[in-house]
């Protein structure tokens, strides 16, 4: 029996020669090792196609090369070596290589007062590339928090003052009566509106960074805002959460400025951009603010 040679269509030349910026695959399932645990990641892998006369790239080479990450921690060095493998397997075809990892990062978070704890999931994206022989790593996280409107809080306080004047207008005020009134539904006639909000932060890491500081970045974001959403709670925790919201009243502009200031203190970052979104409970639309530092492109909404 004559054995036929399998055709290699990708090796054929292309009559209409046009280089392509990015060619590859999106949504590849891959287990990645991070902080001693395995995360189920979706990976986008690709290279540039600078040889416009070439029909295409060797996608199977990229896919198989990803296997090198299954049994080692996900670090900038490991990713850089993989990107260099992409380029060496596409010599004369490609000058740039790209990898994006998207996964959920689980953190066990303690309650504010009680001994309870629970898991929170944070969306994480790691964007990496080699372009012009320079390696870049950008780390993105999405962090939920609570925001209470300062204007609404002021209006609520005014209504409570008016109610106080009405209730105690014609009697001698005694401390016990005031305390009882303040603890009643009649006394606190209004509350400010608050909502679950989201901070989306993208940080460009220094070239000598040896680890992906995902947990540290999340911790800094939550600390700067002061109102991280909770997991398991008892009444004491809920009360502490109410206090935290009252002490951290925020418009979206306030949240964006807090984050900007906190991110400027990070020593392993050389650029960042951020977007905060308050899913308004008063309105049917969202309030949004963005900021950036040392970023190449304007930070659009």
From Swiss-Prot:
GO terms for biological process: tetrahydrofolate biosynthetic process. Pathway: Cofactor biosynthesis; 7,8-dihydroneopterin triphosphate biosynthesis; 7,8-dihydroneopterin triphosphate from GTP: step 1/1. It is an enzyme of class 3 (hydrolase). GO terms for molecular function: GTP cyclohydrolase I activity. Coiled coil: none annotated. The record marks 149 as: May be catalytically important. Keywords: Hydrolase. Its EC number is 3.5.4.16. It catalyses: GTP + H2O = 7,8-dihydroneopterin 3'-triphosphate + formate + H(+). Pfam families: GCHY-1. It comes from the Bacteria. Converts GTP to 7,8-dihydroneopterin triphosphate. HAMAP family: GTP_cyclohydrol_B. Belongs to the GTP cyclohydrolase IV family. This is GTP cyclohydrolase FolE2. It comes from Pseudomonas putida (strain GB-1). The gene is folE2.
């Amino acid at each position: 029996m004559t054995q036929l040679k399998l055709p290699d269509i990708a090796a054929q030349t292309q009559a209409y020669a046009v280089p392509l910026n990015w060619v590859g695959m999106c949504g590849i399932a891959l287990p990645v090792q991070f902080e001693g645990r395995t995360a189920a990641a979706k990976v986008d892998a690709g290279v540039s196609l600078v040889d416009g006369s070439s029909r295409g790239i060797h996608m199977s080479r990229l896919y198989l090369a990803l296997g090198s990450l299954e049994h080692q921690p996900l670090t900038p060095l490991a990713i850089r070596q993989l990107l260099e493998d992409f380029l060496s397997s596409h010599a004369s075809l490609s000058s740039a290589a790209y990898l994006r990892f998207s996964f959920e990062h689980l953190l066990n978070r303690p309650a504010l007062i009680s001994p309870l704890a629970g898991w929170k999931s944070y969306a994480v994206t790691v964007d990496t590339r080699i372009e012009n022989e320079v390696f870049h790593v950008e780390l993105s996280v999405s962090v939920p928090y609570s925001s209470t409107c300062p204007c609404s809080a002021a209006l609520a306080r005014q209504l409570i003052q008016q109610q106080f004047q009405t209730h105690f207008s014609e009697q001698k005020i005694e401390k016990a009566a005031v305390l009882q009134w303040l603890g009643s539904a009649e006394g606190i006639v209004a509350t400010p509106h608050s909502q679950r909000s989201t901070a989306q932060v993208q940080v460009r890491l220094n070239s000598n960074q040896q680890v992906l500081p995902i947990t540290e970045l999340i911790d800094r974001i939550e600390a700067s805002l002061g109102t991280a959403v909770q997991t398991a709670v008892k009444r004491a925790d809920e009360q502490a959460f109410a206090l935290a919201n009252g002490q951290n009243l925020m418009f979206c502009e306030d949240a964006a400025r807090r984050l900007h200031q906190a991110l400027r203190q990070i020593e392993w970052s050389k650029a960042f951009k951020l977007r905060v979104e308050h899913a308004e409970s008063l309105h049917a639309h969202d309030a949004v603010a963005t900021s950036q530092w040392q970023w190449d492109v304007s930070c659009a909404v």
